[in-house]
Amino acid sequence: MGSISSLGYSPDEVWQAYLRRESFLKSEPFDNENSAVARLSKASEDILKVLRIEEPAHRYLDRTVLMAMHCAREAVEQAGWTRSDIGYRTGVNIGSSRGATTLLEELYGAYLRNPSNRIFPLTSPMTTLGNISSSVARDIGTAGPEISHSVTCSTALHAVFNGIAWIKAGFADRFIVGGAEAPLTGFTVAQMKALRIYTNDSDAEYPSRPCSSETPPVSTMALGEGAVLLAMEKKSADELGDSKDRVLGIVDSFGYGLESPETATSISEEGVALASAMNMALYNMASDNPVDLVILHAPGTIKGDCSELNAIKSVFGSELPILASNKWFIGHTFGASAALSLEYALLMLANDDYAEFPYPVVFKNSRRPIRKIMINAAGFGGNAACLIVSKPAG
């Protein structure tokens, strides 16, 4: 696994950041108005700077591509894959809700300011969504399938699903999967504010407060940036041999759902799509052990949080698992959010611990051993996805 976000870029650093229970959302000016966002740490930003000057071709790459490139290298190294392992039987599927947001807005802004000037010749190839996975595939040396896609905020989980399908079908032996997103631009923040869901508490200790019990309820969504990629393959315990210590988690099952849009953000009060996704994942579980913890999608919006909690109650009844979130730490990272949640899940499985909400919420958690975790994601268009991962044996 490789990651980069406001939390840091190494597993130990990220886990320690979670344990501190501090928000990484900071107030910044956007179009003469302050907004809370979670940017990469300075050390993480330095990594991107080094990547950008590493080769002439990297000079024009968008932040999403550079973040994904770093994460892929880390994931391959952590998995112990060699160049000879990778070959044409290794695939890449990286999702992004919006793709090359930063670069596209910069280039389009330059065009609007002076449309008579010749635009940058590489504008089209450098801003297409497919540029993320193709750049990563070249960087790690695979000749296998490379896929980029957007399923809005469920994007990263669908990348995992695709990887599973390719491997199970026998078309690939291993896959790099995950999501990358860099949405911290003036136009993107303005879009969220137009929906009236962005937090107005940019200077608060916790600008984003998913599932808060405060009254009257308020929407407190905020944006962050980051990427997480994971190395995935199908192996038995015997096949793993001495490399079993490299296994971070086991995919138990997954589910997906879709509902007809009822609102501008395609959310129903009952959370129909999420309930469908969770029920499918629970029905297809490989083991009988119950889900101990659910990492919520909960974006910090009134309707979004309420919808998901209603769906969870309809699926689990009165005996709820632990409910956790990382959006009060790092904000909503759109297409990368579920990948960051998956990273959080794997760290929780490794440490048998989680970060409790630092403010009052509308439910009460009861601590228990954490062996199996469900990750939820939902997005514009009425789609939802759910992944269940388990702690490796031993």
Predicted region positions:
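Conserved catalytic cysteine-centered active-site region
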Residues: 26-66, 99-162, 194-222, 303, ...
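Condensing-enzyme catalytic core mediating Claisen C-C bond formation in acyl metabolism
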Residues: 1-3, 11-12, 16-29, 33, ...
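Active-site-proximal alpha-helical scaffold in enzymes
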Residues: 68-78, 129-132, 137-140, 146-181, ...
